Structure formats: C-alpha cells, structure tokens
Amino acid sequence: MGGELAAVRCDLEDFAAEVFEPFARADQRRWGEVYLRGLLLDGRRKSVEPMAARLGEDGNRQALAHFITSSPWDAAHVRSRLAWRMQQVIKPTTLIIDDTGFLKDGDASACVSRQYTGTAGKVTNCQAGVSLHLASDGASAVIDWRLFLTESWDPASPKADPVKTARRGPCGIPAEVGHVEKWQLALDMIDETRSWGIDVPLAVADGGYGDTAAFRLGLEERGLDYVVGISTTTTAQTEGARPHIPPYGGRGPRPQPAYPEPAQRVKQLVIAAGRQAARPVQWREGSRPGSGRSGAKRMYSRFVALRIRPAGREIRKNTDGPELPVRWLLAEWPATEAEPVQFWLSNLPADTPLATLVRTAKLRWRIEHDYREMKQALGPAHFEGRTWRGWHHHVTLVSVAHAFCTLQRITRSPKGTASA
C-alpha cells in the first residue's frame, strides 16, 4: 500500500485512534499506529527490524519490539473494538471459522509443533492459529484468534514433551493454558464475541470442524444455525428410518430402541438418490472474466440436498427420545464427475431453499480470501518473536491492518462493498 498510504494517512490515524482507544498509555497508542503503518507499507518482510527501517524508526527499534512482544496491552480489547467497528460496516450474516498455519524453521516459538497444516498441505513444523471472521456476501473481517497449543506443550497431557513444556516459561505461556481442541477454541471465540455484544446467528466451517459432532452440538446449544463441511465417512440414517424396540426375552435389562439397519456413509446416501436428484445452482460471480451478468465468471455447479438423520454415539447420547434429529445433507455433484465431491451438514429449517444452502456453504470462500490478502501483503506469519503474548499482539494488528484495507475498498467502491 506504499504510495497510497500517504493519501489515506488521516483516515488511518482516525481508525487507529478508534481501535486503539483501549490502550492505557499514549505511547502504546503511538506504537500501535506505527506498527500498523509498518504492516501497510510495501515491503517483503513485516517483522520489526525491516518495518522499523522502512518507517525511519531505526533508533526506536527496541521500543517497537517491546510494544509488540511484551508490552502489557490486552489484544482482546483491541479485537472487541475492531469487531464493533467492522460489524457496523459489514453487517455480517455469518460467522466463519477456520485455522491457518504459521511455518517455522526452529522450535523456540510458542506452540510450535510438527502438525498438519493446509498452508503447506502436509505435516510440518509450524504454529496453528484458529480464527473467527465476520462475513456477508460483500465483505469480511477476521475479529478473533486463538493460538493452538498441542498436547506436546501441555504438561498435564500424557503426550507432553519435556523439551516443549520447558519452553512454556521463556515463551510466556500462561500456566492456566492447556491443550484445547480447535473446535472448542472456535466455540470459545463465539462465546467471547457474544460477550462483546456481537451475535451473528449462523456459522460456517469446513470438515476439520464439521466432522466433530461435539462442535455441531455446541453450535446448537448456543442457538446457532450452521452449514459445516463433513467427510465422506460421516454416517447417517435416512429421514424415513424409524427405531424399533427388539422383543424382550424376559431376562436382563430391557432392550433400548434401535434402528433396524446400520447407518450409511453420506456419500452412499447421495449416490443412492442418484444423479437425477442434482440441481444446478449459481452461488455468486467471481472476479475473473466470464459469462456472468456483470461480465465475470459464474460460480456454478450441481447439488443434491437430502433430509437425513446424522448418526454416531455423541449424537445419540445428546438426543432426547429414540429418534435421531433430522438435518440437511448437502452434496456437490458436478456434471463432469462420476460421484459427489463435497459434503455439508446443516440444521437450517426444513423449508430452506437449495440455493440458500449452497450460498451459505460456499460463503466460506471469504475466509480463504481474507487469509490470502493477509499473507500476500500483511505478513501474519512474519512475527519473529517467540512469546505467546507477542503472537496474539501481532495477529491482532494484522487483523486491524486488513480491516483498514477493507474499509478503504468499501469507501471507494461505487456499490459500497469490498467484493473481490
């Protein structure tokens, strides 16, 4: 944003003053704005040393490093201000949840482990951050983060690694922080945003979250509708299936109601419905040239929607009565494919149109858009400090910088949106 930054300097100062209002001291507000400008300026690396050089703050490099790494400001307070600001503009219809990897060469940074990340497409040495985004059709913003702590970093876990647990002190990891599954971190972030007064009624996530029944149940307990990805191995009964009570033989405990047929994999249920059940749906127009109404490429495929009863021990344990609850199964089955290629579960109402199911499921593209923008220009993985606090400070300010870019696009757009 190099040359453009001077033109919007006043806007940036006003935005920084609003978002950094929770800072207790004037010097924190000053360094917050300086760091924000460093992230927004053109440059290959967005770590302290090169940013200080580009900003002409070489003599204050240590002060900038202290601000981001160890200064005692609460990142959650900044994120809450950011969330309020962006909610007014985005008018979110959906919360989107995902995680991204921060690749690392060494093992000294907080929570670095060998783990799978989609960033690299393999198991590698990295940190993993779970993020929560406000989204509408026209814009989105990341408003909350959690750094995932693997079991190897948790001294209370049987999988604890003594070398890693010894690093907790130097990394400043709070004693009360232990291993928490990513899906639970996502629910915790939803609870936190609600405590800020932000309540969005619909959640979207990929199969890394949707495959976990406890996550789906957690969304339902919070009164949230959802459309979440699932794997082909997820099992379910058909909507018409009914449990029955086997005859009692007169000895032992009475038998409990059970479904006469075993649950089937969702892929088999869709294949059984047949290709003729697939309907064409266009969910949006992309940014590349094409045949859409605006001259852009149409995002289009064929989809099957079935009413089914998701199965599994966790679902049964949390169901009142003998019948499993009915949910939507959505599957994408392109005309060029022999089998369906992607699957989602949803608790949206039974009369929800197919187009609404598809548009909601596909809204997850916004989180990929946010990640791509941040990684290309704002350096979320460029933080070279090793502390727990510093990581949360850095990704929070990257989110602030990304939100400022989004606001500038909305301001300049004739339609008042930031669509990409």
What are these regions (language model features)?
Residues E13, D137-C171, A175-G178, S231, ...:
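An anionic, glycine-rich sequence signature occurring as long contiguous blocks
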Residues H402-A420:
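Conserved nucleotidyltransferase catalytic core and NTase-mimicking acidic/glycine-rich helix/loop elements
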Residues C111-Y116, L217-L219, G223-Y226, Q376-L397:
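Compositionally biased, low-complexity linear motifs
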Residues S346, L354-A361, Q376-H393, R412-K415:
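Short, solvent-exposed helix-loop connector elements
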Residues G2-V204, G208-T235, R242, G250, ...:
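Conserved, well-structured functional cores that handle cations and Mg-NTP chemistry
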Residues E33-V34, E49, Q342, A355, ...:
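Non-catalytic, well-ordered alpha-helical scaffold segments
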Residues D107, Y371-L378:
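Active-site-adjacent bridging/hinge elements
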Residues E368, V400:
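Hydrophobic, well-ordered secondary-structure elements that form the walls
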